[in-house]
Amino acid sequence: MRILVSNDDGVHAEGIRALSEALTACGEVIVVAPDRNRSGASHSLTLEVPLRVTRLGETGFNGSESYAVKGTPTDCVHLAVNELVRPEPDMVVAGINHGANLGDDVIYSGTVAAATEGRHLGFPSLAISLVGKTHFATAAHYAAQLVKGMMVHPLPADQILNVNVPDLPLDQIKGIRVTRLGNRHRAESVICSEDPRGQPIYWIGPPGSQQDAGEGTDFAAIEQGYVSITPLTIDMTAYSSLAGLGAWLDLQG
């Protein structure tokens, strides 16, 4: 089993190191990740400039081959599968993200996008995030457990798993729940300021607070001390709307 590991926090982040070390118990691990933090990159590809790659060898990854890419998480997986990793990997695992990817966070997440790219290219994939920045060993434990399960019982071809783990010691986790995505309120206002020359500058504000966080959501599972696993589909077609949209178009004449 050859496992491609990537992330969006960068190749030197604590989370990807904990993940790659844990997954060596499951097979051969190859790390291909951004050379810096690319959080919020979503599913973007770099098209206007060439991608530059630095081979890091086996430094800091428990003997695993590793590469730093000057690009996005999606670039990393795309480049790894199509060029860098030979023979091809059998699975793609993204994370461990430094912070939650709950609800509509998945739209912006480079971690989820890396897993999605893996699935798009034909490989079983999962994204794993720690809802905090302390207990990476807990998230790594569940990542290894899920990878072992996927080796025996592969996922459906059109799905990835989005996994969120409470920032708790392993013995304080209550269990695992299968969840749906919750939802947040509209993001908070943009933060406006000035640079030293008096020119306006802007910072994207923090995400909105929880809106749909009821029972059955990923938000609720985390709040109650459970690992949340949400299956995400690659096909974004709103099948339930096809007939209604056709009828609406008929009304337009």
From Swiss-Prot:
Main location, first listed in the record: cytoplasm
Source organism superkingdom: Bacteria
Stored InterPro entries: SurE, SurE-like_Pase/nucleotidase, SurE-like_sf
Enzyme Commission number(s) from the entry: 3.1.3.5
One GO cellular component term noted in the UniProt record for this chain: cytoplasm
Cofactor: a divalent metal cation
Transmembrane segments: none
Catalytic activity: a ribonucleoside 5'-phosphate + H2O = a ribonucleoside + phosphate
Cell compartment(s), UniProt: Cytoplasm
Binding residues for a divalent metal cation: 8-9, 39, 97
GO MF: 3'-nucleotidase activity; 5'-nucleotidase activity; exopolyphosphatase activity; metal ion binding; nucleotide binding
Note describing how the cofactor binds: Binds 1 divalent metal cation per subunit.
Keywords: Cytoplasm, Hydrolase, Metal-binding, Nucleotide-binding
Family per similarity comment: Belongs to the SurE nucleotidase family.
HAMAP family, alphabetized: SurE
NCBIfam families: PRK00346.1-3, PRK00346.1-4, surE
Function, as annotated: Nucleotidase that shows phosphatase activity on nucleoside 5'-monophosphates.
Protein name: 5'-nucleotidase SurE
Organism: Aeromonas hydrophila subsp. hydrophila (strain ATCC 7966 / DSM 30187 / BCRC 13018 / CCUG 14551 / JCM 1027 / KCTC 2358 / NCIMB 9240 / NCTC 8049)
